[in-house]
Every structure is written in C-alpha cells, then in structure tokens.
Amino acid sequence: MLNSLGGGASLQITIKAGGNGGLFPSQSSQNGGSPSQSAFGGQRSNIAEQLSDIMTTMMFMGSMMGGGMSGGLGGLGSSLGGLGGGLLGGGLGGGLGSSLGSGLGSALGGGLGGALGAGMNAMNPSAMMGSLLFSALEDLLGGGMSQQQGGLFGNKQPSSPEISAYTQGVNDALSAILGNGLSQTKGQTSPLQLGNNGLQGLSGAGAFNQLGSTLGMSVGQKAGLQELNNISTHNDSPTRYFVDKEDRGMAKEIGQFMDQYPEVFGKAEYQKDNWQTAKQEDKSWAKALSKPDDDGMTKGSMDKFMKAVGMIKSAIRGDTGNTNLSARGNGGASLGIDAAMIGDRIVNMGLKKLSS
C-alpha cells in the first residue's frame, strides 16, 4: 500500500504480487460457470487490477510529488526516462523501492533506464509496461509529450476522485480485453477526444475514466503486438531455420492458425544439407514450429510463418487494408476472423506477462 503525496490530494495504491499461472481463454464468462471458469475469471480480474494499479502509479505518482511527467517525457532516453526521468527514475525509483520493497520500485526505477538499451525481450515486466504506456500516450497526444509545459496535467493536479476514476477506466478496459478478447472489445468504447490543451484540459471523474479506458485499450493492443514483435528466429545453415526456444509456445499457437488454411500456407518443408531440393513435412505447422527436428525448416517455410505473424498483427491493429485478411478457406472459414481470435489470445499472453 502506497499513500501519495503532495498537491493537496491523497491516493492509495495497492500493488499486488504476480503469480498468475496458466493461460486463460479469450471468451466471455457466463453466469453459473464451472469452478474452472470461475478460477479463470478471478485470474483475469487479478491481472486487470494489478496492471491498472501499476498504470496509475506510472501516470500520476511523479506529478503528485511535484515533478509531473514533464520531467521525464522528453526524448526516449529522457522520454522513457520520461516515464523514467522525474516520474520513475532516480529519486522516485528509490522512494518506490523503499515503499514497495524489491518489487515495483526497483523495477520502475532501474528497469526503465537500464533495460531500454538491451531491447524489449530483456526488459522486466514493469519496464515493458512503462514503454507501452509511454507509446500509448504518444499516440494519444500526437507525439507532443515533450512540449507539455508544466507536466501532462499542467498546474492543476488531478484530484483523488479523478485518479480513482482513471484507475477504474483502465481496469474496466483490461478486464473486457481479458474476458471477451480485444477484437470484441475495441468497437465498444469511444476513444478520448482531446482539445488543444491535451490532458491539461481534462476535468472531472468522467473524463479521467475515459482517459483510463483509452490508455488501457491501447496498452492491451500494444502488449499483443509486442509479443509478436519479440518472436526470435535463427538458422544454423542456409537450409535450417528455427524459432527460438522461448518463443515456441507462441509459435505453436500461430502454427495452429496456419494449419487451418493449407490453401494459403501449404505445408512446412525441410532440407538436409546434402539434399538438392526440400521435402514436405508430414507434421503440422504447429508441431514443426514448436518441436522442430534437427533439420528445422527451410527459409521459405520460415517466411510463411512470418507472413502469418504479419496477418495476426494486422488483425490486432484492426488493419482492414490487409487484403490477406479477406481470404476465405475451404468451407468458407474467414482468415480474418481466425487471425483476430489468435490475436486475442496473444494479447492476453502479453498482458499476463506484464503482470508477472
């Protein structure tokens, strides 16, 4: 429990430990569900609550201590040092560290600064969350955060009811994503419309609730895209390509999607060093990607996998311009709908990772 801090406002934030195991399905919960459904519902609730608490800490704690995000939001060394700089780095990082122990404080204080250079795969979850929230704010403000004079909210610091409304907005958005899927949730919320003053023009609990909902939706979407961007592959010869071990669980999910559309993706192929031509795998894409033999797969097959990754990214973004998503499989199945469904699962995987 952390109490804040100056500006005539009082805020209580409880940061809960991780420990959410397993992957939850992307489907609506139903009344009277089985105990396992209830457990999944509780897990989703815990993840949404934990992430909304963290996003509240990142958004408001620096400004309530007098620095605002402006001290940090000014260039990616200082820009993610923005959620880093005055907000999460240096002194506040130490303050959070002593308040919250070895968990969030050290992760926020040191993680954002040091981990950025090592790339997103090397980041701890709080550092990744900081990066995603910064990106969501950049999108919302049109890249103008470094021009925000006096902090994101100006001289008027948000009140405790406004901050609580923001937290609830984030929680509601993330709960909807985790429960119903991003693809089903995106069309149900109206994005926040800002005037020329940006966030400095926000006033009242309703506006801050919508801010939380907008940023929660954006962070959820970006969490899924980041999971796909982080997929790593390697090859040990011109004909042997592999998905890296830590990404094979997700590759299996994508392979199952590819197996639904053999007319689009065909079958994986492999080629031994002394062969002149490749041969078709007798196993599914899901198995070829997640449990490869020593020969791996050909570059052409890996390119097909990356094509599928790109389709799922487009589905997560809601990119209707990707004509591949309009394809129909044998029997009339919609590639776009199935890509959105696997995208929903990957978004949930990303959010779960952020809460760990």
Curated annotation (Swiss-Prot):
Localisation per UniProt entry: Secreted
GO biological process: symbiont-mediated perturbation of host programmed cell death
UniProt region (Disordered), positions on chain: 22-42, 280-300
Coarse class of the protein's main subcellular location: secreted
Taxonomy, superkingdom: Bacteria
The keyword Magnesium appears for this protein: no
Protein known as: Harpin HrpN
Phylogenetic classification of the source organism: Bacteria, Pseudomonadati, Pseudomonadota, Gammaproteobacteria, Enterobacterales
